Amino acid sequence: MLLSSVAYADTCPIPEGGSAALGSMDAKDRIELLHATFDSQAVYAKRWKWAWFGIGMTTLAGSVGQAVGWAAFVDESNPKREADIIDNVIVSGFSVVGPFVSLIFAPSIEKDAPAIDQLLKDTGGGAAGSCLVIARMEELMRRDVSEEEFNVGWFQHVIAVVGVGALFGILFGEALGTSDPIAAQEHRNNAISNSLVGLVLTELQILTSPSGAIGAWNRYLGGRFSAKKTAAFSVAPMFGAAGLSFRVTF
């Protein structure tokens, strides 16, 4: 049981890359700043995860629905019928990856935030062993920042292009494998349209991926803790609906 006389340390050691300004900051202020960053970024990460899960499931349902629709309601004499059934089945196979990746590889900061809440609860808001509390918070934040940097880095864009390129290649290959010119053109049309949509959605998913901890961590290391708030513009997937949300935060 913690005693009310437990007090915060005046100052705590500086993490690697930290400035002298950070070292002179009160332990309590450092804890509060890190805690606020965990909380705000966890909220965004959760919304991002479920928004893109919803977008992915909508895309999957659309592809499956079109395949079923062409199979059930379009006359077999229609030269586009088989091409659209095949292409939508292929697109469905690619679409199933997105929503489950959003869940399996959800940003770690979403689960780290509750762990920090529990840590602060167990230590009286960080007063008991404040420097150890800060060290643990910094450890988790550094890991989450590294993850965010990877998730928005160039490699993710390469993966996006490769994945969409594979989809385009498979659909275009179907066009090369048919002798019916109408069916071949339908395959080509589907290759172009689905690849463009896939690339746009994938890039938007990367560009809206949680990255706020990166800037917050750099400001923390630099000891820039001015109470003055600045405006920040961001684009995010809408939570609970298809579309994008443009927002300005202060």
Predicted regions and their residues:
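N-terminal Sec/ER secretory leader and immediately downstream segment
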Residues: Q41-E76, A83-D87
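Mid-membrane cores of alpha-helical transmembrane segments in multi-pass membrane proteins
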Residues: I55-G62, V91-S95, V158-A166
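Glycine- and aromatic-enriched membrane insertion/assembly motifs of diderm outer-membrane
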Residues: Q66-A71, E82, I86-S108
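Juxtamembrane "helix-exit" motif on the non-cytosolic side of transmembrane helices
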Residues: A67-S77, L171-D180
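Hydrophobic alpha-helical transmembrane segments
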Residues: P79-F94, A183-V197
